[in-house]
Amino acid sequence: MKVTDVRLRKIQTDGRMKALVSITLDESFVVHDLRVIEGNTGLFVAMPSKRTPDGEFRDIAHPINSEMRQEIQDAVMKVYEETDEVIPDRNAQSSDDSEEA
């Protein structure tokens, strides 16, 4: 399985979230709401998640092996580094501050 498209929107927020991302896999399946997060050791790609009733975050889609995780990370970060435009995002949720780094 290959990442065949990355759509990325850098955003300006007070939190650690730096971009919202959608990826296409094998030109056949789209995953929305990935995020580029500023962690303690640098930027990383967080998978789409939802808050559970106990306040924790749980991924709703994620790779099941390290090779696919690395492919997603590499593809997203390549586009992130190539994107200059930053959009102020008034609707960004501050939930990114509770993500683990």
Curated annotation (Swiss-Prot):
Q: What InterPro entries does the annotation carry?
A: SpoVG, SpoVG_sf
Coiled coil: which residue ranges? Answer: none
In terms of superkingdom, the source organism counts as: Bacteria
Q: Does the keyword Cell division apply?
A: yes
Keywords carried by this UniProt record: Cell cycle, Cell division, Septation
Q: What biological-process GO terms show up in the record?
A: division septum assembly; sporulation resulting in formation of a cellular spore
Has the keyword Nucleotidyltransferase been applied to this entry? no
Q: Which family does it belong to?
A: Belongs to the SpoVG family.
User: What is its biological role?
Assistant: Could be involved in septation.
Q: What is this protein called?
A: Putative septation protein SpoVG
Q: Which organism is it from?
A: Staphylococcus saprophyticus subsp. saprophyticus (strain ATCC 15305 / DSM 20229 / NCIMB 8711 / NCTC 7292 / S-41)
